Amino acid sequence: MLSADKKNGIMKAMETIIKKIDKYQIDEDAIREAGEILREGGLVAFPTETVYGLGANALDEEAAKKTYEAKGRPSDNPLIVHIADLEDLSEITENVPPETELLAKHFWPGPLTMIFEKSSLVPYGTTGGLDTVAVRMPSDLIARKLILAAGGYVSAPSANTSGRPSPTTAEHVWEDLNGKIEMII
């Protein structure tokens, strides 16, 4: 993937930055930097309790397009929106069934994804053109801190080229997406 050198107007190959973060001593500066990349529409791969996710600003149509491009994924394949706080669910959904709170309190944070009617805040690029949005709240502390630093809503399919095995390490992500995304944490 190419990026523009704003100073000289020259296109150059993107270099993916890797920031090693110890889950027992989280580098808040690295989290803030990754969050800023996401807020500005860039892509950051990050760990969850299952696999590495390819994070983007879930409320940014252009960020969704970048996700599909980096993965080589069809744009009608919806992305899952990750949240860090249950209260954030009401901003991106409508007509939430009462059973949701019971499920969320039992299974979130954790690897449960629930599907809801989307609010107007969520672009169709994120939902693959659907009127519904898939939402989950990961239990991984690094993931949750990143989601908060990014503004609360991060779309994140697995951080791999479509059709390849889901990555379980930063090295797997690097081998597959180096040069296509801004950062791996």
Language model: regions and residue ranges:
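Short, low-complexity, charge-dense intrinsically disordered segments
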Residues: 1-5
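Active-site-adjacent structural elements in enzyme catalytic cores
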Residues: 6-7, 12-185
